[in-house]
Amino acid sequence: AVIFGATGGVMEAALRTAVESLTGEELPSVDFTQVRGTEGIKEASYEVAGMEVKVAVASGLTNARKLLNMVKNGEAQYHFMGCPGGCINGGGQPQQPGYVRNTTDIRALRAKVLYDLDKSNTIRKSHENPAIKELYSTYLGEPGSEKAHHLLHTTYVKRKING
């Protein structure tokens, strides 16, 4: 899904798949806007197939630390994946000069473009993407398989920002 690059995009895509997998029903709307945004901590709770599904998205390490402290103190319970600003703020993105970063919220603009693209896509659910279905059936096996995990997960490498 194109929204993977925005903070909360992976969570939103995962919710689309999880809800349909758990209920066996097609979603009336694929937009989970409560988990969108490039700042702070976004928490949401959904009733799915008689279960409460609680999710949170933290933008940046400061917010991740706050969320981890909430878990540590027994105030919240979540599983984690951390991306400061999402992929739209990652080391693989074009770097902007300091004067642009100081005057323009590039992350918000990039996120808006991704959500606009997502709205115009015919296929908006990862589990319905024919290319993904083909990849799993011919190469990776089942979602969550050892091969899929090994090939599709990475580790963080700090990148220097120019400018």
Segments from the language model and where they lie:
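Iron-sulfur (Fe-S) cluster-binding modules
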Residues: A1-G163
